[in-house]
């Protein structure tokens, strides 16, 4: 039945089309009731189905909307990042354009700061009074500082002190403490301002020095090299000159008199000359005795001249500490070791300036009451007799400079000069006269007794000794070493054919055979012992037997003698003989006599017409 044909509920029929007034049978009534119940169930199911369909549709829509929102949010974030990056690039490009479009900046040297916060600046060759940018703290500006100027000549930035320029030598600091007299190129003198760091160094007390620490400032003193801007008229910093610092070695040597063998008499002489005046000044004043100003140690090479000079400084420091009641372990003295040949300089006046600086340094140290030893090694190389120069006459000005320092108007208190040379005959006589180098001590070659003393310094009880040698003296190490030394010295000083070294012929026709003992030295003895120790080490590696043997020492003597065979073969045997300590009649012929080697034939060498290099 169609919808139009179905009776309406409002026209007296029920939902199933039956009129309530129509009489029904019991069967029809039961069927009608059954249909009504089924319709009610279907109506409920229909309502439930409609609600389920609507709910599912709404959840699906929500998920779709959420997914779309997430996608839009991601796109939005990506666009934000892109915009931010583009903005940063635009800002960087704008800054780069602004930077490239800026006018050039100038630089100047700050001369002074005024009360109205303006500043005087030296720039472009002119002195100008300029204003400062508001972000510049004028109280923090320092004289001599580099400042940056903009196009309007306004100070916009404070920099560091200038680090390049000309080198000038400080002559003196003026009374105001802010200016100094310096000597520049070609001895041109000028007055310059001192930058604030140099003013602070100039104000340090006299005893203040940087020797106690690398980070501490050092007092500014005449002779220092300064970095100077001659146009601005400012000195910025002290520049240490390496060539001067290297020539002077300030140290307290650790060598004592006990380390020196075979020179007892010479040590006594130098102790009397150096230590007594320092330790007993009252007695010297009481007897009106003037202490010596200098000592000359002369003699052949390798005999201990430099060693004695070091021991003097060490002993003097300890004795002075005992007199003052100080701890001997903290004894202090200064040993200024001057390397003679390196003192020479090709520029006129530089050598003399170095000598002045050396003695100035010595006086500064001595003013504290500390003994100062100024040691000139190879003294003949720089203070030779005036007028004897072959290629130059530098000694004509260097020698007077030393004389004026030793015996000039300005005295030397607590300073003693020690010179060492193996050609004392070449040193200018004015230096050697009394009143300058008063004491002259000859360091001779060691004799047999001295050689035993020297050997005992190197052959000690701590050394490993071979069991076979120890067994000969019942295991007594001291007796074994003593016997080893005696045998070695007897072999070294024996006048046998194996020890013959040279046959020399003098100008008067006399001939003389010289043995190796005539050319022995402490350095040669040390070399012999070192060779023996090396042989003992090789024996351990080869045979496994440990310990030093007497045979090692005897073999070392033979090797040492053999190595010296060709040393006398020089172009000037007379000069070689003088250096070696053989003086007297002029030598014209030399013949080597080393056994086991091919002896050279007799050679006539004229020492007057054939001058050349010597050993």
Swiss-Prot record:
PROSITE patterns: AAA. Residues 1-36 are annotated as: Disordered. Residues 25-102 form a coiled coil. GO terms for molecular function: ATP binding; ATP hydrolysis activity. Pathway: Protein degradation; proteasomal Pup-dependent pathway. One of its GO terms (cellular component) is proteasome complex. Gene3D superfamilies: 1.10.8.60, 1.20.5.170, Nucleic acid-binding proteins, P-loop containing nucleotide triphosphate hydrolases. Keywords: ATP-binding, Chaperone, Coiled coil, Nucleotide-binding, Proteasome. ATP binds at residues 302-307. ATPase which is responsible for recognizing, binding, unfolding and translocation of pupylated proteins into the bacterial 20S proteasome core particle. May be essential for opening the gate of the 20S proteasome via an interaction with its C-terminus, thereby allowing substrate entry and access to the site of proteolysis. Thus, the C-termini of the proteasomal ATPase may function like a 'key in a lock' to induce gate opening and therefore regulate proteolysis. Homohexamer. Assembles into a hexameric ring structure that caps the 20S proteasome core. Strongly interacts with the prokaryotic ubiquitin-like protein Pup through a hydrophobic interface; the interacting region of ARC lies in its N-terminal coiled-coil domain. There is one Pup binding site per ARC hexamer ring. Upon ATP-binding, the C-terminus of ARC interacts with the alpha-rings of the proteasome core, possibly by binding to the intersubunit pockets. Belongs to the AAA ATPase family. Consists of three main regions, an N-terminal coiled-coil domain that binds to protein Pup and functions as a docking station, an interdomain involved in ARC hexamerization, and a C-terminal ATPase domain of the AAA type. This is Proteasome-associated ATPase. It comes from Mycolicibacterium gilvum (strain PYR-GCK) (Mycobacterium gilvum (strain PYR-GCK)).
